[in-house]
Amino acid sequence: MAPNIRKSHPLMKMINNSLIDLPTPPNISMWWNFGSLLGVCLATQILTGLLLAMHYTADTTLAFSSVAHTCRNVQYGWLIRNLHANGASLFFICIYMHIGRGIYYGSYLYKETWNTGIILLLTLMATAFVGYVLPWGQMSFWGATVITNLFSAIPYIGQTLVEWAWGGFSVDNPTLTRFFALHFLLPFLIAGLTLIHLTFLHESGSNNPLGVTSNCDKIPFHPYYSLKDLLGFMLMLLPLMALALFTPNLLGDPENFTPANPLVTPPHIKPEWYFLFAYAILRSIPNKLGGVLALAASVLILFLSPLLHKSKQRTMTFRPLSQSLFWLLVTNLLILTWVGSQPVEHPFIIIGQLASLSYFTILLILFPLAGALENKILNY
């Protein structure tokens, strides 16, 4: 019998083992769809980004007008830009859902997969931040100024570090040039890290909603989940197209339609919606260094998830107490996101401080306590 090229060719064999003959649990739900959705998001962003980079000029005098030129004069330039800008929002929706799924179903117990995932999240956040600076509007410029300035809170080396990052004494041409270089490079780093993430995942196999081993009755990825993923792609493409074609500027800041001006500060400097929860945590601490540490901790705390798992059951499927805490955490994050978009005044200050406190309390104290308590109730 002739050898099956799909199973014998070195490259085809890798693709086959990852996407076709991959043994998959038979009971994974739509929550397991977000991994492949993130892959599609990344591919879309790289493609649209490449097309935009062909028409973009990384210079302070030309950046803003080069983006305007792309939208006005390039064939479908407006569509490419709208897809790229709103694709970023969808990317973050998917990654937050993906992380939420990981927390709910105890996927963080695959430590290597979880840790590479968090590194991916940090890289994605860095990419989105430097990308937001490129159109060189008011919010781009002031966002870059505020966020890079946070590094000056680092004792002893802070100021030197910031000036080194800026390439001068303020955010200017060298900053824009290096941010463009980084924004071009980082997505390829993300693609590389994704392969590492998948390598670790395929070492252990996928988790499932019950959190029990499913080795005895796994099914091939194709055609079952390839088709199920295709449905996910369609459902994701729908809101993306609706956003890009009907309300392309819904999630953007109107301030960014004004070219960057170092002499005029916008009344409310705020990042894109997907960073607002972290921004609210940063603002809720009146001390600069304290705020920066809290900001870093808000994401880095995810590294502790495997250590804080005290329950004898892996998933939250049969743990109502932990479930309630999980949804409390989700609500809390939504409140933080809302507070981050509001001006710094009463009552938003105190709401932000309480929400920040409860964010860390739920993750660090209440989750482990609930897990231990549930063990006791169930006589484990």
From Swiss-Prot:
A ubiquinone binds at residue 202. The keyword Heme applies. Binds 2 heme b groups non-covalently. It comes from the Eukaryota. Keywords: Electron transport, Heme, Iron, Membrane, Metal-binding, Mitochondrion, Mitochondrion inner membrane, Respiratory chain, Transmembrane, Transmembrane helix, Transport, Ubiquinone. Its main location: mitochondrion. InterPro entries: Cyt_b/b6_C, Cyt_b/b6_C_sf, Cyt_b/b6_N, Cytb/b6-like_sf, Cytochrome_b, Cytochrome_b_C_euk/bac, Cytochrome_b_N_euk/bac, Di-haem_cyt_TM. GO terms for cellular component: mitochondrial inner membrane; respiratory chain complex III. The keyword Heme applies. GO terms for biological process: mitochondrial electron transport, ubiquinol to cytochrome c. It holds the Pfam family Cytochrom_B_C. Belongs to the cytochrome b family. Heme 1 (or BL or b562) is low-potential and absorbs at about 562 nm, and heme 2 (or BH or b566) is high-potential and absorbs at about 566 nm. This is Cytochrome b. It comes from Falco sparverius.
